[in-house]
């Protein structure tokens, strides 16, 4: 009696749903060893990422992100098949730490080669790009002592170190530009917005290592609704004491109209968001104006238990109308510097 009860509890019969067709299996590196012995290549990035689809966990989510991004790219083909004549608009959002890191060069590649149409970033995502043109950022350690670093004029971003002299160079570089912008505002009636301000910085830096430079060259707008929340805000603050008869004025309302108009006029919309916070919400909310995006890829390490926007999965945005109910969507949980270069290698750069 006891044995029968226990067996009934343990050996419950399975009823496999019809949609469970993919068996879990990892990459067989032996196969690629044999190919190398025959004079061929080892495993390629595309083959590795394809194998992720059957590994499970976040590997499968990364595979799905690659699949979704490649579908976005297919809809951006300049000569698409007739059934895909509605060209997709791709929105890219990223946080400032990614520009501080070597992900900057990955992002620059996307902008240089016109892989995306609209960008949203934070103030740091703007200023750190310029600052890197003026002085290097170094790899340090997460555990360096903050008090000692401060005494040496070294700023820590995770395990990255930015000499404070770089920000001094930034001030020297940007102040003459702010002077010219104020002059144009007062004498020519130039109406500045955060995005036109960023575009001007891209023009002035004139450096091919810069994301902003390529955005200027390729006419890709960069929006930053929290532009004053960083070193740029410090510079604007200091400049108010020198500007006459009035300081530089940036019209954020004009930018929200332009940002939302990109979404409203998009035939189809895909969003790629690296990190969370303002960049994530700004892009998603713009897509609300068109009843949601058709494709969505989130990559961040935040969880949803605290109700944060950063932690929210794409399905939460579906409830708000920011992503369509039938959209292709995925969230990859992980750190962007580890994941995004691999994703780009399997999509835009393949």
UniProtKB/Swiss-Prot annotation:
Gene3D superfamilies: Deoxyhypusine synthase. GO terms for cellular component: cytoplasm; cytosol; nucleus. The active site is at residue 322. It catalyses: [eIF5A protein]-L-lysine + spermidine = [eIF5A protein]-deoxyhypusine + propane-1,3-diamine. It comes from the Eukaryota. Keywords: Hypusine biosynthesis, NAD, Transferase. Its cofactor is NAD(+). SUPFAM superfamilies: DHS-like NAD/FAD-binding domain. NAD(+) binds at residues 96-100, 122-124, 128, 229, 276, 301-302, 335-336. GO terms for molecular function: deoxyhypusine synthase activity. GO terms for biological process: regulation of cytoplasmic translation; spermidine metabolic process. Belongs to the deoxyhypusine synthase family. Catalyzes the NAD-dependent oxidative cleavage of spermidine and the subsequent transfer of the butylamine moiety of spermidine to the epsilon-amino group of a specific lysine residue of the eIF-5A precursor protein to form the intermediate deoxyhypusine residue. This is Probable deoxyhypusine synthase. It comes from Schizosaccharomyces pombe (strain 972 / ATCC 24843) (Fission yeast).
């Amino acid at each position: 009696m006891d044995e029968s009860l226990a067996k009934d509890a343990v050996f419950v019969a399975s009823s496999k749903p019809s949609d469970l067709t993919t068996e879990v299996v990892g990459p067989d590196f032996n196969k690629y060893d044999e190919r190398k012995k025959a004079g061929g290549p080892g495993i390629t990035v595309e083959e590795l990422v394809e194998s992720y689809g059957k590994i499970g966990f976040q590997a499968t989510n990364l595979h799905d992100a690659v699949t979704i991004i490649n579908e976005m790219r297919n809809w951006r083909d300049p000569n698409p098949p007739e059934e895909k004549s509605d060209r997709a608009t791709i929105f890219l959002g990223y946080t400032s730490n990614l520009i501080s890191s070597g992900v900057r060069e990955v992002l620059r590649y996307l902008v240089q080669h016109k892989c995306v149409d609209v960008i949203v970033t934070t103030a740091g995502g703007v200023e750190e790009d310029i600052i890197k043109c003026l002085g290097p950022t170094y790899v340090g350690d997460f555990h360096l002592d903050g008090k000692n670093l401060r005494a040496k004029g070294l700023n820590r971003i995770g395990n990255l170190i930015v000499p404070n002299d770089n920000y001094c160079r930034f001030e020297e570089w940007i102040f003459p530009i702010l002077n010219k912008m104020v002059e144009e505002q007062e004498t020519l009636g130039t109406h500045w917005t955060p995005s036109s301000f960023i575009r001007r910085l891209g023009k002035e830096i004139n450096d091919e290592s810069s994301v902003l430079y390529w955005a200027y060259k390729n006419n890709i707008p960069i929006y930053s609704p929290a532009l004053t929340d960083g070193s740029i805000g410090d510079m604007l603050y200091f400049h108010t004491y020198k500007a006459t008869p009035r300081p530089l004025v940036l019209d954020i309302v004009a930018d929200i109209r332009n940002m939302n108009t990109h979404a409203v006029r998009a035939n189809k919309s895909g969003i790629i968001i690296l990190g969370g916070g303002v960049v994530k919400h700004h892009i998603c909310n713009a897509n609300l104006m068109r009843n949601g995006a058709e494709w969505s890829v989130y990559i961040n390490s935040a969880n949803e238990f605290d109700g944060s926007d950063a932690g929210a999965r794409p399905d939460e945005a579906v409830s708000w109308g920011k992503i369509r109910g039938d959209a292709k969507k995925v969230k990859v949980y992980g750190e962007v510097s580890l994941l995004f270069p691999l994703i780009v290698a399997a999509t835009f750069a393949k």
